[in-house]
Amino acid sequence: MSGSSAGSSFVHLHNHTEYSMLDGAAKITPMLAEVERLGMPAVGMTDHGNMFGASEFYNSATKAGIKPIIGVEAYIAPGSRFDTRRILWGDPSQKADDVSGSGSYTHLTMMAENATGLRNLFKLSSHASFEGQLSKWSRMDAELIAEHAEGIIITTGCPSGEVQTRLRLGQDREALEAAAKWREIVGPDNYFLELMDHGLTIERRVRDGLLEIGRALNIPPLATNDCHYVTRDAAHNHEALLCVQTGKTLSDPNRFKFDGDGYYLKSAAEMRQIWDDEVPGACDSTLLIAERVQSYADVWTPRDRMPVFPVPDGHDQASWLRHEVDAGLRRRFPAGPPDGYRERAAYEIDVICSKGFPSYFLIVADLISYARSAGIRVGPGRGSAAGSLVAYALGITDIDPIPHGLLFERFLNPERTSMPDIDIDFDDRRRGEMVRYAADKWGHDRVAQVITFGTIKTKAALKDSARIHYGQPGFAIADRITKALPPAIMAKDIPLSGITDPSHERYKEAAEVRGLIETDPDVRTIYQTARGLEGLIRNAGVHACAVIMSSEPLTEAIPLWKRPQDGAIITGWDYPACEAIGLLKMDFLGLRNLTIIGDAIDNVRANRGIDLDLESVPLDDKATYELLGRGDTLGVFQLDGGPMRDLLRRMQPTGFEDVVAVIALYRPGPMGMNAHNDYADRKNNRQAIKPIHPELEEPLREILAETYGLIVYQEQIMRIAQKVASYSLARADILRKAMGKKKREVLEKEFEGFSDGMQANGFSPAAIKALWDTILPFADYAFNKSHAAGYGMVSYWTAYLKANYPAEYMAGLLTSVGDDKDKAAVYLADCRKLGITVLPPDVNESGLNFASVGQDIRYGLGAVRNVGANVVGSLLQTRNDKGKFTDFSDYLNKIDISACNKKVTESLIKAGAFDSLGHARKGLFLVHSDAVDSVLGTKKAEALGQFDLFGSNDDGTGTADPVFTIKVPDDEWEDKHKLALEREMLGLYVSGHPLNGVAHLLAAQVDTAIPAILDGDVPNDAQVRVGGILASVNRRVNKNGMPWASAQLEDLTGGIEVMFFPHTYSSYGADIVDDAVVLVNAKVAVRDDRIALIANDLTVPDFSNAEVERPLAVSLPTRQCTFDKVSALKQVLARHPGTSQVHLRLISGDRITTLALDQSLRVTPSPALMGDLKELLGPGCLGS
């Protein structure tokens, strides 16, 4: 660049985008727009210590016609990057001028001159993270940079650079040596003297020294502005962002902030006014660098980077794929595959090989084969891959696509240009093992998990803004604002700009919050600052499932990041950016339901001695379809919600295809067109099946028969196009995609071809129009049948387990919800409904997790508060080695020191885990502290190996006479207190419930069950009357000084949060106390994913004069009192819930023993119940 243009232009090279997280406030798109407005030909990006934004910056700048100059403001270790000590160069009095981060790093500005230099920056930033991490800083050193210096331009950097730091410390010789070192590393043409002027003393103090070094070493000057935001008026947004980073408020005089408002993209005239006279050539150097920087296009050129699967000698990947598919078909069909299977497989292989994907299929098959060999449960298939017979033969999927009508072309076809996408579900507890296996197999430098970026979203921006302006009181204002926002749609709030933009589609919905902004100055201030924060990147995270794999070291293609907290290697770019350059992305998904299935199968093996193979269970199991028809699907994969259970009851599924259909239909699109109810009604002959057009009745009969004349699946659209318009299935897939995109010009072109094809087959214009008009809206929501079938199989398996092995399945389900006490309460209530008793934890019987014991479930010790998995493991090992505990003294004598602490012991006592030893809980509580103290000394001696000096049994079992005994008092807490402590430790009432004895009376006075509200059966704003016991009462004061309270209201079936706002609290506050049994009239409040109640009033019922109902007596000879018979009886009783107590009369000759059954088995004595009991136990079972 020369002439007048050079003398008037400028290029900003030192810029921090939002990828300098919580420090840079410059979004890339606005930054490029400002560069274009300023008429600058190029712009640089130098984020702090990372290259996360390189891909977005390159693509956006290139699209805008602006040359991108990609760099990084690197952190340089003051010594070796491997040395994690903090090193200071000056004396203690110079601390403020010394190495940044209290001795952690200096800065160095680095830019890529070409593609080679950019790849070297990828390597440098990656190794800085791998090897130089100190606190939050990824640090390089001179040795590392020297190894990867080719194609890199560096500068002395900002005032925190090494040279400037030495100058501030008065170490002029060391400053000169540092400059000479860096100049030698990159060469004299690639080292520049970086000069900044933001009016800061720290800059002026070293300027003369810098210029002197520049003259001595012939280093050209380079003018930069340390840009952290785009325009001067965005300085306030940047101040706010720094407060978000540091947790400070704007009013804090000691907060970290930038001095002045000059850290923006200044015009060329502004920059030249600063520098042209003082340091001639400093601005021109920016243009020189911009001119020298060559295209980076090669870095972003897509190329095949898929790992090449190793195959035996004599094979290539294609021939080995054929071999493996053939072997797989023989394995799947020992008597030989059915007609047409080999032809279908051969066709699929031809397509796979023609697209260059045989290695991909072999890689996926290898991953799944390893998982199965390691006992890691794998899903039967998800997404369109379930339509591939090759995938089925290789064991990638477990669904035969042909009998289910699944299409390979929906997954892969000759017309498709993109990579196939096979997502894999694994047991979620063991997903990490699969990532490690992939890294071990293909190279730890070639496999990485994938980065994600968390942005400051609408509500978070408002809350952050409120806090930094007003501190803690600001949260109340933010709460008012967020509650006034329109409801989120698909978990997305209206953007803040849309609130005041009349052109935004949701503008009218935002009238309430707009009113607050217009009338309340505090709200307006918060809103304006929040707009500047919204959308900025807050942090980097890891994608839940994506994994990137490459045939070459990943740092040859992208930057990497080592996550400090666990050492995981993560890509520096998100997965679309990685895929765009040809890297292989796979999704390793952790599916909780596979974990539940695995636990349930383990429970069945332990409890019944049966090894279940779910892949072999029949798909026509009667008990499973009866369970589905009853809607008893709480905890069943995909079929759990209240409306879904209602749909199942309407549908009455009778085959696996119904399970697939219900998963496809239960979504907003089909439900909006009432397709889910139409399917149920047509299946059960409540609605006639009408053809789309008389001419189409016969041609489409076979395609639409399984869905009763409705178009439910995308595959049906493809088959229809094939049948009536003579499309190939590959072309039909293109039609399907076009219909889903709804672009008018594309649809018109597709209709033309579709119409021509139908006309050629003799269909009338009326039939063509009728079909097109039917397909078009259905195409928008028709579901991928392959995916529905894959997930339908998991749904069927979980339903099968619940129907046939209820205790084992529910134990797995309870284990899976962990600390989610709300979910656990719902599932415990379902256990009661199923006739399953949930037993308290027990030091002699419990394992770590919930476990099935006969027809009941035993609480796991790991579910007890303050009792960790390591402690439980130690306790179980002791029990296994030394036998069960006979009493509390024996327990303390036997357990390892790691389990012998007061907190653990107290928690186990309160949870009832020692009940089976015959001690009262209160008695144990009174003595446990002194008891633990008494044995700790001995156990510490044992741990040091000293106790053996005094002898143990000759056999080495260590069961000498107890060294400690204690007398436990018989004192016991009253039931109410005992249950309260139990709930404190377990989150739930287990051994009993405060409502036992009155729950039936309470139920008679309410109109809505709590689970119905939580399941979404009750609409927002509905008025309900509920009852239960109050827990976790939390009294608060609002910003106006008015008291209010929140509490958990629990009955025997679940719990829900209730808000008692000031107008209600003022009348009923005295009755809002823990453990109070109450009736509440309330309004349902649904906000985002949260459901709560807003109380209108409260009543404390009086049950003192309640009429006692006569128990229902059921007689059973003791010879019939078998496990199966009692289990069946409990299930019958659970199907007829009510308020009547049940007495079981056990008859043995002339002796009759009467047992009062659990409160959870109260019934309604209806004719239906009497009939069920007589059918199960015989006609004489109801005699008195």
Swiss-Prot record:
One GO cellular component from the entry?
Answer: peptidoglycan-based cell wall
Please name the InterPro entries in this protein's record: DNA_pol3_alpha_NTPase_dom, DNA_pol3_alpha_thumb_dom, DNA_pol3_finger, DnaE2/DnaE/PolC, DNAPol_HHH, NA-bd_OB_tRNA, PHP_dom, Pol/His_phosphatase_N
Domain of life the protein comes from: Bacteria
State if Hydrolase is listed as a keyword.
Answer: no
**The entry's keywords:** Cytoplasm, DNA replication, DNA-directed DNA polymerase, Nucleotidyltransferase, Transferase
Coiled-coil intervals, chain numbering = none
A GO BP annotation: DNA replication
Any one Pfam family match given in the protein's UniProt record, by short name: HHH_6
Q: Say what the protein does.
A: DNA polymerase III is a complex, multichain enzyme responsible for most of the replicative synthesis in bacteria. Pol III also exhibits 3' to 5' exonuclease activity. The alpha chain is the DNA polymerase.
The similarity comment for this entry is:
Belongs to the DNA polymerase type-C family. DnaE subfamily.
- Its name, as the record gives it, is DNA polymerase III subunit alpha
What organism does the record attribute this protein to?
Mycobacterium tuberculosis (strain ATCC 25618 / H37Rv)
